């Protein structure tokens, strides 16, 4: 029996992917492989109109992301406009291109929160992963400058098989920098990370050791009165049930790409679903009425075993993008789930990780030339 149309609440979190331009070449970047096709970017006025519409709908948090959002010269103006509208604003940055004068301008414009990402705890590995020899010292300097301006000190480390074994040193660096919050996020396999999965996915043993390191540090830090919050995000490739991706399709999160495509999650543009542009439809119409945003809302779309599963209200059938990447159909159950007929895809990935000997230098790095080669090859 068909269920009633699901209740749709406003999007609480808006992510503005301002640009795909970036000075780094991280091989786990979540940007689309064909980002080099996407040269157009919304203008300052167009972005502010997106913010205005989202705020009118009830959005409360706005993240500035990319690529590297610092490449936008109008970033202070965008921050000020968002602040004037009443958003809580968050800058998600590599720190490359950040200066003390820019920090002062952002503070004056009303920026609430800055998150700086690192690739590793040491300069050599950081340079190898970022493709930039000067990145590490710049990140250190800007992390200290952020702290000096009384922003919440939030550091992000993407963990994978090449840096997860230095987790103790990573945490020590965060303590040294007096971080308030540390996101230790094991690589999520979308975009460039999926392309490099065999060379990035940690082994089960590495994950287990990392969990123990985090647990030990939490205990040690609590005993010493250190209030730094360590958030450790494990890869769902070693779980038996999928994550409730984005809190459910089209439930709380709305992303807008550099050229204006509206998406229910960062990776959804790869799906064989037409997603509308903010240049052609209002944000309200896109959120409530568009086919793309309604495609996987509720439960009626679900095949078995999801449809009759007593956990469907918790995980929503898992990740649609992951189902598409691993099975060829976004309608299928997320293969992470042990009930999925495609769970063997996850088991194969685990076996690959256990045997992989791919070095950092052998990864496919995210850059414009590589992106052009990838989509030219796929167009043949």
Curated annotation (Swiss-Prot):
Pfam families in UniProt: Radical_SAM, SPASM
UniProt KW keywords: 4Fe-4S, Iron, Iron-sulfur, Metal-binding, Oxidoreductase, PQQ biosynthesis, S-adenosyl-L-methionine
Described purpose of this protein according to its UniProt entry: Catalyzes the cross-linking of a glutamate residue and a tyrosine residue in the PqqA protein as part of the biosynthesis of pyrroloquinoline quinone (PQQ).
UniProt GO molecular function: 4 iron, 4 sulfur cluster binding; cyclase activity; iron ion binding; oxidoreductase activity; S-adenosyl-L-methionine binding
Pathway membership: Cofactor biosynthesis; pyrroloquinoline quinone biosynthesis
EC main group: oxidoreductase
Cofactor names: [4Fe-4S] cluster
Protein name: PqqA peptide cyclase
Gene3D superfamilies assigned: Aldolase class I (3.20.20.70)
